[in-house]
Amino acid sequence: MERKLNFIENKKLKNYDPKNYKEGYLKIGKLIVTYIYRKDKIKLDGTQSHPCYLYGYGSYGVIDDPTFDKYTMSLVDRGYLYCIANLRGSKFYGPKWYHEGKYLKKKNTFKDFQTIAQYLIHQNYTSPDKLVVEGGSAGGLLIGSCINMNPSLYHVAVLRVPYVDCLTTLLNPDLPLTIGEYNEWGNPGKYKTYYDYILSYSPYDNIDLKKQYPHIYIDTGLHDSQVIFHEPLKYYAKLTHNQHFQQNTRTLLFNIRTQSGHSGSSKRYQQIIDETQVLTFILKQNK
């Protein structure tokens, strides 16, 4: 029996024509990067580098399927190459791929993300002075770890409700979600092997006060029960002692959303305001 898809409905959006955009994917070994760009703004042939936004998560088996997003299009319409990285720690290739990016193999997630960033630069699709990276929650841990490992690779880093003081959190079983997190990261309070491994990549614990970091935007929700606001705040406070942020050669911005939780605000227009603030930061630093 032949199977086919039937077209049911097409919702037309103002100021949007899908014919203006090119979608596709890059394959870097087993790593898959999905992308979208505007045809009249970008030629993806390596002859010229472009501003690039690279998103990553890579935890809990979550697969980042590309979906239409009005905030994405705001960057794409301004000439950005918009990319989503599928990393070990997701289930993009199934359970084995997930297990290759958790517990004592968590650093594989960070290696994958950096491999993708380096590939985009090597192919001259972008350059270190044009590359924006973003991750939220466990994706914030990803970004925080990567900018510690190789800060010169990125120009702007956006960390949304980031899980950046992971070791301290995992050592406190009285917090509501800690015990459940042992299934993803391990139990550092019980096993020294996990303690040492998590310590080696924890974004907060590995901040370098002398290195030049990218421009950094951090946000948190005052009512976040998953990554409690004091965790990103503690991370921000330590970063303020970095000599380049003190000398204002790099921008460091912390935004606490007083009416938001882990997934943002439930108010009708507040999400638009919140996302506009992030886009403004990116565009201002990535002129």
Regions found by a protein language model. Name each.
Residues 2, 30, 49-50, 154, ...:
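A structure-centric signal for secondary-structure junctions around beta-strands
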Residues 2, 29-35, 226-234:
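Conserved long hydrophobic alpha-helices within structured protein cores
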Residues 87-287:
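Active-site-proximal cap/loop segments of hydrolase catalytic domains
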Residues 6-132, 136, 171-172, 259-260:
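Cap/lid segment of the alpha/beta-hydrolase catalytic domain
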Residues 1-5, 164:
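Structured, non-catalytic alpha/beta "coupling" segments that mediate domain-domain communication
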